[in-house]
Amino acid sequence: MADGTINSEEMISASSFQRLIDIGIALSAERDTNVLMETILLEAKSLSNADGGTLYIRTPDNRLKFEIMRTDSLNIAMGGTTGKDINFPPLNLFDLETGEENHKNVASAAALTGNSINIPDAYENESFDFSGTKKFDEGTGYRSKSFLCVPLKNSQNQVIGVLQLLNAVDADTGEVIEFRPDIQPLIEALGSQAAVALDNQQLLESQKRLLDSFIELIASAIDAKSPYTGGHCQRVPELTKMLASAACEQQDGPFSDFELTDEQ
């Protein structure tokens, strides 16, 4: 930009930076976990122009659970708000017999090392086991080629999941290409935002569960004090739910405009 003009690459960079800011704001405001995870994957696919992708979440027993799957060209949409369960078993981060780290799978390797892995062509790669991918391709006629796996690290630098993108597509030719080096930092930045949002969401949910446990404990103690009011604290919430549900279903009358959000 020596002559004071802005070239196309700088415009794209500025646009992507603004896009990341907008995505970060949206992620921090989302309170539905399924919608949050879907947004993370869909925005990553959009930024990288990827045909498919998978979002894995790390479980307490050190496995990567499939949470969201998308492959546009095959019309595959599973997990999240779709209501379609993902039947693939979780990926083990450690061998169940030896306890050794599982670096054969590209997603588990990204989780274990904490580093992004960019593979131009899975069929030419000898570092990872893509036998499952090739079997999937044989059954669907698909051709899995380029992969980009990004670990999701929270504020404590702990890997809580993996974002895996599949088959970057050239916007001009429609050809499947490798994920460009300039795209990887964008996805990594998105991954950082996603990890913080997911971590905060998990923290909120754990706090809600703790609060619910305290309420149930107090209610049980109150009910146990008197044989005359036993079960009262258990019945009141159920009756309240029934009344609220009935009010929401009203099409006319004083409660026709009454509506509760999922969070409420």
Regions found by a protein language model. Give the residues of each.
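GAF sensory/regulatory domain recognition
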Residues: T54-E101, E124-N125, L163
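A short, aliphatic-rich beta-strand micro-motif
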Residues: K145-Q156, G161
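Histidine- and acidic-residue-rich, metal-dependent catalytic cores
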Residues: S213-Q264
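Signal-transmission linkers at sensory-effector interfaces
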Residues: M1-T39, S46-L47, E67-R70, L203-L217
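Signal-transmission/dimerization alpha-helices at domain junctions
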Residues: A2-D3, L112-S116, V162, P185-E205, ...
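Regulatory loop-to-helix N-cap segments in sensory/regulatory domains
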Residues: A2-I12, E138, R143, Q158-I160, ...
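Signal-transducing coupling segments at domain and membrane junctions
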Residues: K65, N102-S108, N115-S146, A168-E178
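Short, hydrophobic-rich beta-strand element in sensory/regulatory alpha-beta domains
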Residues: L42-K45, D51-R58, N62-I68, A107-A109, ...
